[in-house]
Each structure stands twice: as structure tokens, then as C-alpha cells.
Amino acid sequence: MNKGAPIRVVLFGVGVIGSGVLRLARTRPGVEIVGAVVRDARLEGRPLEEIVPDGPTGLRLSADGARVLSEMRPEVVVIATRSTLPEVLPTLRLAAKARTAIACTAEELAYILPGDGPEAAEIFGLAESHQVPIVAVGLNPGFVLDVWPLLLASIAHDVSAIDAERAVDLSGFGPNVRASLGVGYSATDFDRELARGKIAGHRGFRESLRLIGEAVGRPVDETNVRTSPIFAKRARELIGGELSPGQTAGVRQLATGTSAGVQWLRLTMTASVALDEIGVEPVDRVHLSGSNDLTAIISPGSRAVPSTVGRIVNAIPKVATAAPGVHSAADLGLTPARAVR
């Protein structure tokens, strides 16, 4: 990396989050987007400005990630595509073989160990064999329900229990993300798709629980996640679709972590396009129980899309200089936005 030169970045994924990354990165003199990779081969060669009018100029979309990495030689690859390890593993392989630092938003990457399965073992192997950092970045997991409680724990005397909650408005997301979060189903379809795994609600609860447990010296040996639907009371126009009364408007979820038979971690998520109908305001809240109880609140809550985008772009300089290996979001340290002059 040339000292003083912008960090060269290739982005995989130009959805809602990826588009936001492109827009914000354009305002950062220390970051230069040199490539944008999409899955849809029909978009090959199209000017990026046609998809993201207020993003970087002079770039064309490509569905050939290997070629883009070879030609553009980025210092950082940002992967903002899918949620699970099997889904992002092919892109992680490409980026690691290109020997570039990697920032990835996949929720299942937020906290992994080599023994967590074949995909996790391969990811650790990629980082070691190619001597690159693979860094988990994101808002949740990655900040609200894990890193933020740990920051608060920095001023605690001890921690006997943690209770964190998040209420988030989903109306800023497109139809694919909404569907995975449980929006737009009948009651019967919701139950079926939840059982099949198509509806995940919030992914990353288990990763956040394990991350917190390891960080405070009380490893979690049992996790549990319960999910229930929220139903719409009236029709709503949404991005790329509409919602009818009686369809699901989102989910309520409770995740718990237990250590040696003691449940001491509770993470709660209310995610809906109709928070107003259930009398809930967007909010992030964490309460630490201990010798000196602590409570912190972000109100009206960190908005999902812009806050995730900020978390990613602000992390790029740290990712570029990270040591080789697999890093959780807690390993990043502070990544504040730059002051406006």
C-alpha cells in the first residue's frame, strides 16, 4: 500500500448495502473504488452510474470477479453479498488467492473458530496459506448486539448478565432481504418457511452470544433462538412490492446464551416494516448487570442500512492494515468516521 495514496477497493455485491458503500466511499478521499462485481451476468459491462447514479464514476460492472481482482489489484475486497459461510466461501477463496485484505458482511462469519465445521476450517486455512486478513464487519452482528455491549463492559466492575435489545424498521430493505426477515407471508406460509430455513429473521444471534461470552471470559455452551411473526394490520407500499393486511410484517426474536446451566445472556430483536402498529419505536438498548449496573440507549436506534454502510466504510483503513488471520468484528477496535472540516 502506497503511503498517502487512496486504498484501492473492489466491492462484491451492489444491492442495498453495496450501493450505500459505493455512495459513501465516493465521499472519502482515502478510499478509491476500483471495481464492482455482481452475480448477474446480464449486467456485465453496464456503467455503474446506471445502477448507482450517485456512486463512483467511470466504472463498469463485471460478473467476472477473478478478472477484476487480477486487473485492478485492490488492497481491500469488500464482500457484501450473502449471509452464510457456504454462500460467501467461493468469493472468499477468490479474494484470498488474490492476496488482498478482506472485509465480509456475512453474519455467520461474525465469530467463528476453526472447529466450527468444514467451511470455518477452510476460511482459517485460506487466511493462513495466503497470509491475508479476513475480517467480519457489520452492524448486527458486528456492533449493536455484541461489540457495543462489550464497549459498555469496559467500564463495568464485573458482569453477571447482559440483556440487549434492538427494534429496527425494515422498510428500507428490498424484497429479497424482507423475505428472509419474515415479511410478506401468510401465517401458514410463515411457519412452513421458518421450518425450512428460508425465513431466518436476524442471522447472527449465535455468533453474537459466543463472541460476548468469549470476550468476558464466560464461554457460552448453549444457545437458543425463538422466532414469532408480527402481522400487518393495514396495507403498505414497500420498496419493490406491497404488503396486505394479515400478512407478516416482520418478526420478534429472543436469543439466549447459557453457561454451565446458567442463562445470563438475552438478545432481543423486533424487526418489522410496521413498528408503529405494535407501538414500538426504533431503539437499541443494552443493560449490564453487575456490581455497578449499566444501561445505554441509542434512540431512535441505529438505522439498519446507513449504519451498516458506515460500519463497513469506516472499517476499510483498519482492514487494509490488519494482520493475517480471521478476525471478528470485536478485533477491529475503534473505527470512527472522520471529522467534517
Spans of features found by a protein language model:
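N-terminal Rossmann-like dinucleotide-binding module
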Residues: 1-52
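Conserved N-terminal Rossmann-fold NAD(P) cofactor-binding segment
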Residues: 40-72
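Short, ordered loop/turn segments at secondary-structure junctions
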Residues: 39-41, 82, 106-110, 139-140, ...
